[in-house]
Amino acid sequence: MAKEKFERNKPHCNVGTIGHVDHGKTTLTAAITKVMADVYGGSAVDFANIDKAPEERERGITISTAHVEYETDARHYAHVDCPGHADYVKNMITGAAQMDGAILVVNAADGPMPQTREHILLSRQVGVPALVVYLNKVDQVDDEELLELVELEVRELLSEYDFDGDNIPIVKGSALAALEGRDDNIGKESIVELMKAVDEHIPQPERPVDQDFLMPIEDVFSISGRGTVVTGRVETGVVNVGDEVEIVGIKDTTKTTVTGVEMFRKLLDRGEAGDNIGALIRGVGREDVERGQVLAKPGSVTPHTEFSAEVYVLSKDEGGRHTPFFANYRPQFYFRTTDVTGEVILPEGTEMVMPGDNVTINVKLIAPIAMDEGLRFAIREGGRTVGSGVVSKITV
């Protein structure tokens, strides 16, 4: 059967369900696909298909994730749901499934639980821009005051991690009722209300081409009589012939002008996000540029050596280390296109980090790298990946 053509007539947004085990994330995911399919067309995905999510390998890490899609009046959504807590941790840290926003599911009868807190913290650390809350299983709570108490508790928890706890929409309902097509007031209607809140509260992500120009440099060539050409895939933004750009990272930042852009040996006026290009740069010698630096819009990105990060350390089964690491561990940190050695400083009270753990660390690199909060990296030893991380805060 031929694949359906993807109709891009609505803006696209990536979301996911997060929250404590058994609070109803997968049931809610199934309920959203059902209700949205009834209202806007599309196909419902049943619970069993989401629950037995296939295992994927992303950067050597085994992650189970289920992907579903649906649409509302305003947008087309791709939605991820993970069966296990470990899958969430890995998914969020590696960025395997990008989230422009998340739906936090909290069981009204239990209130926030340890993983509720951990998923909110992870969302903060990895830069999920906005959350919306679904207070699930409200039919199991008879006492209105108890519901209000749980809502208050959730808001306080969100505020504690710098989300806008006072104003985040909290929708109350029962995902199971919606899925089973009963009690519409807490079932179907709550799902419609939830998706309206998601439409309004989760900002439309900026498309990569609308962001500032950045291209990680993969290779450098010298073309006699023409000068130096750097090649790479444009990550964000657009570069036009004649634009002034900066070369950032590893060495001192230098300014240059792009005098030519080519793709597949054809000359272009511009290169944009997603294009693999060669950029001819003026007045820069072959030995002045190297793989691992980036070409960027002047002033848009700065080089740093010290940062804190949220990392996941691969388990032995995933091909990671067999033994823990301790303070002063010095692996390579692989950013975009290159490895830089760095020293790991562990948080107070943490003696060691075991394979399979996730932990917040501080890192001191021996050379500066162009970085922003939210940048992903791999941790490597002798060319093999032993961990994955995301920059949560730049310190120097």
Swiss-Prot record:
Residues 136-139 are annotated as: G4. Residues 60-64 are annotated as: G2. It comes from the Bacteria. Transmembrane segments: none annotated. Residues 81-84 are annotated as: G3. Gene3D superfamilies: P-loop containing nucleotide triphosphate hydrolases (3.40.50.300), Translation factors (2.40.30.10). Keywords: Cytoplasm, Elongation factor, GTP-binding, Hydrolase, Magnesium, Metal-binding, Nucleotide-binding, Protein biosynthesis. SUPFAM superfamilies: EF-Tu/eEF-1alpha/eIF2-gamma C-terminal domain, P-loop containing nucleoside triphosphate hydrolases, Translation proteins. It is found in: Cytoplasm. It catalyses: GTP + H2O = GDP + phosphate + H(+). One of its GO terms (molecular function) is guanosine tetraphosphate binding. GTP binds at residues 19-26, 81-85, 136-139. Residues 19-26 are annotated as: G1. GO terms for cellular component: cytosol. Its EC number is 3.6.5.3. Residues 10-206 form the tr-type G domain. Mg(2+) binds at T26. Coiled coil: none annotated. Residues 174-176 are annotated as: G5. NCBIfam families: EF-Tu, PRK00049.1, PRK12735.1, PRK12736.1, small_GTP. Belongs to the TRAFAC class translation factor GTPase superfamily. Classic translation factor GTPase family. EF-Tu/EF-1A subfamily. Monomer. GTP hydrolase that promotes the GTP-dependent binding of aminoacyl-tRNA to the A-site of ribosomes during protein biosynthesis. This is Elongation factor Tu. The gene is tuf.
